[in-house]
Amino acid sequence: MHLTALLLSGCTVNLPAPVTSGDGFFDRPWPSDTRTIDGRPDLSDFPHLGEYSLLSGFIELGESLDGFGTNTPIYFRFDGTLPTGKLPSPEQSMQADAAVMLVNIDRDSPRRGELIPVEWAFQETTTNWQPENLLAVRPVWGYPLEGSTTYAAIVTTEVALLDEDFSAVWAADHPDHATYEPLQETLFQLKVPVDSVAIATTFTTQDTLGDMVAIAASIQQQLPIPILDQELEAGFTTGSFSAYFGEIVVPMWQHGEKPYATEGGGFVMDDAGNPILYGWDRTAFTVTIPVGTQPDDGWPTVIYSHGTGGDHTTFASGSTNVPATLLAQEGIAVIGISQPLHGDRGSGVNPALYSFNYINPEAGRTMFRQGALDQVFMAELMTRRGAVFTFEGQELRLDPERVAYLGHSHGGEVGAKAVPFFGDRIKGAVLSGTGGGLGITLIERNADDFDIQSLITDTLEFDSDEVLDTFHPAIMLVQMDAEATDPINYARYWHRQQPTWESAPMSVLLTEGLLDVNTPPHSTEVLAGASGSPMLAPTAQLATIQELTGLVEEPTPAISNVTGWDGSDVSVGLAQFPDDGHFAIFRNYEAVQLYQTFLSTALEDEAPEISSFTP
């Protein structure tokens, strides 16, 4: 034991030392900017490399990224057992005297010095995938790291011996000093002495939103927007609305041949970073027009985005509780197209299998973003000039000044990514059965259609005592690859934090059923937390982020209850329905009234109202 470490740490005879060298993936801290090739993660020593075909595509994609994950674990290995009783709670980790810290050290970030709350897990024994004495630390769900930003994770001498080789990086002549100098400066800012740092790693996150920013800008500023006006085909009529069918062309940014089963499906940029359009999808749409007198300026309209397995007719057919009926009662028209690979945009395959494409991670990373860009395009199409349809000599007009959004499940997931790009075009958005944090979904999803947990543990030959959780390296790899499509990385830009592109704070109502087996309720709660949206009263359960922020029990009715980044007020919140599952807005009358009121008030050029409800 080094005398220096003894003096710094007091009675430290039982403290372990960090492992900082060796041939294994975990024998050095991960992630680290010293473990990259041309700025891209080096996964060449990932456990069991080449042994499992399921992971091969994820490894290849991971090594193509321009940085590390924003919601992924950070790993430190030690030569003995850590005193875990001294490791911090999430709340304690936000203090500069915590034994483990995660801090923004980016010189160009306005949030440099910000401590991110963390959760941790300690693996004491060796498994097929993890060595003994492995500490995994990650941001609390709902606190995603920002893209293209440098962070540091720190373990102090309170729980581990100081590593003499690592501490040499503080010297200006050390070859890695430039990598760690921003951390050294930030520690000085936080009044944390460098000799209290047992081990640390610095890493730069990937550009999670760059592709979406570029393509959304292309849609809104460069792409020719087609004229939607046309003679509609007859659909069907109910006591509340008439449904019609038409045709639309949608820009396709995914390159390759559908359904992208084993290859293709990615976005392509030119040398200047501009998106390359692959082509146009010609597809059907459904529009429903309420019974009654058409307003002078046309019908206020909701763009509907359906769930996995649905199509452009879903919102208008199936029961009396469909959105077309319920919104027609409020004098609102609804329009929708099929998701990518669904309905007439498919290729005869199961859309669920290839929408969540674990065999071809490149397509899995872009499929839902293509869906989000479809909705950005629809918003542009509907608000730039509206639409004037005809049917048997009758004019059916949609008002371009009054457009809102409703997405359920798959449609909520794509909507969560589209909201930051809607700007002031859309008056408000409702997201039903929508979650963030792919790692949570991989661990907690419990639907009968697909057992993702067994697929992972069986295929990767987990030991009987190996735990599959969000700290596991297999989940880390998938989450890192999927950051660009994870709604959790978009939520801060709904209304809480100003983005770098032109936008406006958005009023957003989220709903969840606590019996949901498709979208884990935990994932919905962390998505709300990431956006800065409060839990509406009555609150039935919380995630850790709500415990830290205190954004709970928001009274209703709630109108303009949160101030956005530009000083404007928005109406936001998450409504919970404890006795409902994935389809709360279709089966619970209180949930129905909630979204009816929210959307109708938003389209009346008023602040959207989140009405009182009894779940």
PLM regions and their residue ranges:
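Acidic, low-complexity Ser/Thr/Gly/Pro-rich repeat segments typical of extracellular/periplasmic
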Residues: 13-258
